[in-house]
Amino acid sequence: MDGKRRQAPSSGVPPKRACKGLWDEDEPSQFEENLALLEEIEAENRLQEAEEELQLPPEGIVGGQFSTADIDPRWLRPTPLALDPSTEPLIFQQLEIDHYVGTSPPLPEGPPASRNSVPILRAFGVTDEGFSVCCHIHGFAPYFYTPAPPGFGAEHLSELQRELNAAISRDQRGGKELSGPAVLAIELCSRESMFGYHGHGPSPFLRITLALPRLMAPARRLLEQGIRVPGLGTPSFAPYEANVDFEIRFMVDADIVGCNWLELPAGKYVRRAEKKATLCQLEVDVLWSDVISHPPEGQWQRIAPLRVLSFDIECAGRKGIFPEPERDPVIQICSLGLRWGEPEPFLRLALTLRPCAPILGAKVQSYEREEDLLQAWATFILAMDPDVITGYNIQNFDLPYLISRAQTLKVDRFPFLGRVTGLRSNIRDSSFQSRQVGRRDSKVVSMVGRVQMDMLQVLLREYKLRSYTLNAVSFHFLGEQKEDVQHSIITDLQNGNEQTRRRLAVYCLKDAFLPLRLLERLMVLVNNVEMARVTGVPLGYLLSRGQQVKVVSQLLRQAMREGLLMPVVKTEGGEDYTGATVIEPLKGYYDVPIATLDFSSLYPSIMMAHNLCYTTLLRPGAAQKLGLKPDEFIKTPTGDEFVKASVRKGLLPQILENLLSARKRAKAELAQETDPLRRQVLDGRQLALKVSPNSVYGFTGAQVGKLPCLEISQSVTGFGRQMIEKTKQLVETKYTLENGYDANAKVVYGDTDSVMCRFGVSSVAEAMSLGREAANWVSSHFPSPIRLEFEKVYFPYLLISKKRYAGLLFSSRSDAHDRMDCKGLEAVRRDNCPLVANLVTSSLRRILVDRDPDGAVAHAKDVISDLLCNRIDISQLVITKELTRAAADYAGKQAHVELAERMRKRDPGSAPNLGDRVPYVIIGAAKGVAAYMKSEDPLFVLEHSLPIDTQYYLEQQLAKPLLRIFEPILGEGRAESVLLRGDHTRCKTVLTSKVGGLLAFTKRRNSCIGCRSVIDHQGAVCKFCQPRESELYQKEVSHLNALEERFSRLWTQCQRCQGSLHEDVICTSRDCPIFYMRKKVRKDLEDQERLLQRFGPPGPEAW
């Protein structure tokens, strides 16, 4: 609903159709069109009212329960055929793996049943036929390693096990009692730490196997504190791999990756026919050692027909108060279902409170009691049985609201939305904080067996946008606008009639439909499935965890193959290291081609070329102690030492080589593949393989992480700096007049992994040819697989400063540019108002595309003049910034934070929350007032005619971006005098505020419409302008007509967007410029009508 600060659905006019019954559905391909355009069928529906009444459901359905009779059979999963575990294998794609504690049943060739509590892994998935599966995996226990103390032998194992058991039992008193021994086994084995090259090979380690995963933390702590071992005293034990999640540990050992296909061989599993613990169609038990894991290659790359459900709710809030589940009812829940691989939803359902008119293409089910509505949706979820649940802000609003509302109404059977029978869906608060995104508070709703993909959370994590409302992101990615209905208006629609409730249901359906389209368009599901497969973690981890778990999974897999162990490192924020090199830019406007050469996968390539890894790191002085020859190790630019691959091949280089070679294979398959679904999968796979190598480097540099290593990360950036500088030297020494080239080449800029070269040629084709030649020449001077590649040519090129430049980009063809490329400029940034981005973009287009710098200057001066004369629409002046933490946590006063606090005092329900982006404008105030005190809500400004501080926008928003662009062209001193001084800045228009200040104590007096002199009567003109009264009246009427025409056009535009040319516009989308225009024109119309009333009623002569 709009309460989630996003748009309600829009619609339009559908094609006329023959009459259908209430439960009949249109062809799926018509659904979007029907949603877009519904109103033209109103007349036809009224003509067919009698026939419609015959097809309405019986009265008993309103207020009744949602029974299986109300469910379309097409919504249900196919009925599984008889499965004989003794002769038929079970093959399914697993989507989620978790664990629980229970008792183990007897299994073929397995240990006898035990009453002790044991961890049981649970894999949820889907077969090729679409059957849902829950596989209970038995026999796997948690374990970790620790180095054996000096003198420790096999005779000490039983004593240590007894002592550790006793210590854990004492530690667990007062908590959950253990049903058996805490330590199942302690074994001696040979392993080696992965941290550092020691030269002595494997050493004795102890593998400690525990009964339950929750015992890992106390066991690790007690061993670190010291455990008595008879004959050896009380040694302290350093833990290895004790901080690995139980699910990751199992997946590594069983060679299972996220979302891959599992096979249970015939005769190795048992099907649960009775006493099922879940709602899945097929529920089985199997030993972990009997599970066959298929690597996601070839035929095993396919994705099962997953069922995706997208839903949205609407609530009836009170005026001016954001809906609260304790008081405000849920009035509609709309759901759409999609099978992965099919083009259209197979399910469209609107559950409404109170009767609702039919909607073509959707099934409408109405209820008189809210309790029945909620229970009906819960029953529907269990019947439809989705694998993936999506929507927009469902994580922080829809799901928590539904569960809290059901609790308030005591709908006890509602909150069982997962797949485990009798397991309640709970809400818990979660907080995430990082340097990149700040702090985000959110809620987590448990729904075991189903994957939640909240599209809002996906977009916040993956994309940098100016606004994250559903309307804004739909327009950005889908090119669609939609209506935004304020939460207070929703109540009025609900309290209307069947037609207004149908209009609300159409909005709600669109709100459920757009996240589904975003999920498909952005390939969110496919990309995450492939990332889970590449990195080896469960799908849910990608949506709820950070980057490090993906690298840990890959590291553990490679380490296990080589008998290496990952230590547990206690991390604290340590010293930082020098970042990448940026060659000082030669600022200016280049009207010659500039070739860009780029290092392919620079940091991963450096790690592979120089064998940089935990396992190859030498401690200071270790090379001499180990007797290593000079050609057996390297010294990095930062002074750190690593052994070469001839001595030991590093784990990280092996992981990176596997990722890069797998990407080459995936791209080769993608080029040959013709099936659209397989192309999606392969494209998602190559994208995951492209992103993953860079996270390996980031993992080593994370100072607060699982395994930070400053020596690796600083060595990588050290080599990178060295290579950029060497590239500059090589290019500038080879491409010279002395060597027979047309000009002396010059590197005008270099940043991290790329250099921009001016070869002195006049054509793009020549620059491309020299760029390719230079890339091959430079690559020959670096060890494999480091490779410099020709990437593109900029012509012309505007180099402003470090990390700020723009140019026309040529990549493949020399006769036509691909696009205008901007980096670091306000054209692509989102921390300023749209006016800045639009003006910068239009100026750059005139400079680069039109090659007309003078025209760009004239255009910029015109816009500045319009700004100072108050001719710029307020939508162009809105600044948005994210509220990343509470007001008290900011070091200084911030404009958007102070406004959020003021809005909270005005209306707590509509005030922004943590994580929201706050829109504001800067208004005029007394001289010396701080900017943060002048921020105001744009709608409040329009309603109260508050003046805009145009000088602030000129000096603080426009000035610096414009000077950055024009100084390289006009010169530093001249740019400011030309753009920010002169005749175009001398005329200013200031609005008079209706509120605040001295206006509260003043009395307004009328002025003559003709000459503006003060008059002491209520008329329109003074006695001197009386002869011109008719002329002035006609002029004002003409102005009124122009305003009416403008308002009519804007109103019609909004009606088209909402899909109805017959209903009032109720949209309040703050992301839409037309909304602000409509509000402004409406107010101007009211003022103009009041002005005309001063002329008095027309006299008899007018008739």
Curated annotation (Swiss-Prot):
What is its subcellular localisation? Nucleus
Keyword entries, A-Z: 4Fe-4S, DNA damage, DNA excision, DNA repair, DNA replication, DNA-binding, DNA-directed DNA polymerase, Exonuclease, Hydrolase, Iron, Iron-sulfur, Isopeptide bond, Metal-binding, Nuclease, Nucleotidyltransferase, Nucleus, Transferase, Ubl conjugation, Zinc, Zinc-finger
Where does the motif Nuclear localization signal lie? 4-17
Q: Which PROSITE patterns match?
A: DNA_POLYMERASE_B (PS00116)
Q: Which residues bind [4Fe-4S] cluster?
A: C1054, C1057, C1067, C1072
Just give the chief location class. Answer: nucleus
The protein's superkingdom reads Eukaryota
Does the record carry NADP as a key word?
no
Q: What is this protein called?
A: DNA polymerase delta catalytic subunit
Organism from which the protein derives: Rattus norvegicus (Rat)
Taxonomic lineage per UniProt? Eukaryota, Metazoa, Chordata, Craniata, Vertebrata
Gene label: Pold1
